Amino acid sequence: MKDRYILAFETSCDETSVAVLKNDDELLSNVIASQIESHKRFGGVVPEVASRHHVEVITACIEEALAEAGITEEDVTAVAATYGPGLVGALLVGLSAAKAFAWAHGLPLIPVNHMAGHLMAAQSVEPLEFPLLALLVSGGHTELVYVSEAGDYKIVGETRDDAVGEAYDKVGRVMGLTYPAGREIDELAHQGQDIYDFPRAMIKEDNLEFSFSGLKSAFINLHHNAEQKGESLSTEDLCASFQAAVMDILMAKTKKALEKYPVKTLVVAGGVAANKGLRERLAAEITDVKVIIPPLRLCGDNAGMIAYASVSEWNKENFAGWDLNAKPSLAFDTME
């Protein structure tokens, strides 16, 4: 049987990435060109800057991904691309490059939901058994997803306001930490104590929804009031207290979801899945189901995860036409 190679593209935000997946499960290359240094001085991602960077490096990323995989353009058998959710200008760069490559070589084009990519990155650890539950935590999303089979995703709970990664970056900015602040807050949290009383919104309510805006506001108010009074606060203790509140919320809702949807596997994915504190809480508290977390290199935005997610779409022959457009607000279906 002839080997099949998927060339995957991911440009939904501030990472330009191209990857090659062989025979559905062997990631031969996963090239990532990060823009973090360009966005640091702004304290967040600037959409126009992100789009320009994607345009500048996308061709080089394609060439490097093919070279690292040890294949040529003629060896590629399908092309996959993120078409949403994300920044519309950024999405269009990767999607346009993918469409051009597929059209030029007469290859099928596979549309992939960015969040499905995060979820299916867990496939790199071991074959997934369905049905399963997923906790997706990133800079733009916080949601619980029920997956009955590969490619069938239903949201069963999500944030009402801020995503967890967004909350990390906003409190990090208040403390003067470097963007993105998640890793530094995690490290500082392990050096401090949970001594500040921050709210855990909806933690006792019988639903699967999250809310982090109240926690973020309480943190900002505490920090601001201390500055106004000339009081000194421990950055380590602030981080420890903030992270403890976040983890209490995530764990409470995830446990409720596992009670409502009895599955054997919990996937935890997205950029915040790299958080050491979250991994520690999961290991200590979720012991009756298998917990699968992608390796660190596949937690952030990358094309490797898009390649993994495209496999089920390819098997279903869910191909896109040349009129496929970016959908910045693309979402999974919601399940009551």
From Swiss-Prot:
Subcellular location(s) per record: Cytoplasm
Top-level class of the enzyme under EC nomenclature: transferase
InterPro entries: ATPase_NBD (IPR043129), Gcp-like_dom (IPR000905), KAE1/TsaD (IPR017861), Peptidase_M22_CS (IPR017860), TsaD (IPR022450)
GO biological process, one term: tRNA threonylcarbamoyladenosine modification
Residues the entry annotates as binding Fe cation: 114, 118, 301
Cofactor note: Binds 1 Fe(2+) ion per subunit.
Keyword annotations of the record: Acyltransferase, Cytoplasm, Iron, Metal-binding, Transferase, tRNA processing
Necessary cofactors: Fe(2+)
A GO cellular component entry from the record: cytoplasm
Residue positions binding substrate: 136-140, 169, 182, 186, 275
EC number(s) recorded for this UniProt protein: 2.3.1.234
Enzymatic reactions: L-threonylcarbamoyladenylate + adenosine(37) in tRNA = N(6)-L-threonylcarbamoyladenosine(37) in tRNA + AMP + H(+)
GO molecular function terms listed in the Swiss-Prot or TrEMBL record: iron ion binding; N(6)-L-threonylcarbamoyladenine synthase activity
Entries under Gene3D superfamilies matching the protein: 3.30.420.40
Database matches in Pfam families: TsaD (PF00814)
Protein family membership: Belongs to the KAE1 / TsaD family.
Stated role: Required for the formation of a threonylcarbamoyl group on adenosine at position 37 (t(6)A37) in tRNAs that read codons beginning with adenine. Is involved in the transfer of the threonylcarbamoyl moiety of threonylcarbamoyl-AMP (TC-AMP) to the N6 group of A37, together with TsaE and TsaB. TsaD likely plays a direct catalytic role in this reaction.
Cited NCBIfam families: gcp_kae1 (TIGR00329), T6A_TsaD_YgjD (TIGR03723)
HAMAP family (UniProt xref): TsaD (MF_01445)
Name the record gives this protein: tRNA N6-adenosine threonylcarbamoyltransferase
Annotated organism of origin: Streptococcus pneumoniae (strain ATCC 700669 / Spain 23F-1)
Gene name as annotated: tsaD
